[in-house]
Amino acid sequence: MNGPIIMTREERMKIVHEIKERILDKYGDDVKAIGVYGSLGRQTDGPYSDIEMMCVMSTEEAEFSHEWTTGEWKVEVNFDSEEILLDYASQVESDWPLTHGQFFSILPIYDSGGYLEKVYQTAKSVEAQKFHDAICALIVEELFEYAGKWRNIRVQGPTTFLPSLTVQVAMAGAMLIGLHHRICYTTSASVLTEAVKQSDLPSGYDHLCQFVMSGQLSDSEKLLESLENFWNGIQEWTERHGYIVDVSKRIPF
């Protein structure tokens, strides 16, 4: 296995159509639509990019996938019923800015009834409250927990974990910003560079990202100071935008 190897877009699309024909031969009328997503769907694939496809099935509760490599290239094909796919497209979790971009750049390969457009419209029309709730959950479930971790490091170490924790905090901050602006990042590789270009960032976020993007993660004191500044910035930012986190006096149940 010496891959991935360099391939052209034309070579990838030839494989896509081969897979499409295989799907139609095997599943026949059970197939409603087939599309390509990811960099290949956006037409921004690089020489080593993989192939990602989705298949809308008429079978109720269909939900499975195939992921494989030939040793030279890799493919992932997700098979979902229309109901399951629409339900997922309408969900908003903390990682929505990274997971749901697939629904905004689907390249149809086979679509007998406009199903992929329906998926796109569903993802596009998610109600604002879901984003609000996801932001509040992200602050409690991830960022608050991370704050405890870096404060523990300040007191008792180990500082060896601080660089990777800083990267995690920067990524969580990017999800916060993406949810607030309701944008999906192009790729995981471009999350931070795209996040810092957004308007109305929490104070301290841009400075924190500069450490991560430059790889300057060896000075523990500077990292801890930057993390605290960002955490303070989040407090002011959430209050300004009305993201009220429920705080229980003791035990809420």
UniProtKB/Swiss-Prot annotation:
One of its GO terms (molecular function) is nucleotidyltransferase activity. NCBIfam families: ANT_4p_I, ANT_4p_Ia. Homodimer. Thermostable at 50 degrees Celsius for over 30 minutes, at 55 degrees Celsius for about 9 minutes. InterPro entries: KNTase_C, NT_sf. SUPFAM superfamilies: Nucleotidyltransferase, Nucleotidyltransferase substrate binding subunit/domain. Inactivates aminoglycoside antibiotics such as kanamycin by catalyzing the transfer of a nucleotidyl group from nucleoside triphosphates such as (d)ATP to the 4'-hydroxyl group of the aminoglycoside. It catalyses: kanamycin A + ATP = 4'-adenylylkanamycin A + diphosphate; amikacin + ATP = 4'-adenylylamikacin + diphosphate; neomycin B + ATP = 4'-adenylylneomycin B + diphosphate; paromomycin + ATP = 4'-adenylylparomomycin + diphosphate. Its EC number is 2.7.7.-. The lineage of its organism: Bacteria, Bacillati, Bacillota, Bacilli, Bacillales. Keywords: Antibiotic resistance, ATP-binding, Nucleotide-binding, Plasmid, Transferase. GO terms for biological process: response to antibiotic. It comes from Bacillus sp. This is Aminoglycoside nucleotidyltransferase (4'). The keyword Transferase applies. The keyword Nucleotide-binding applies.
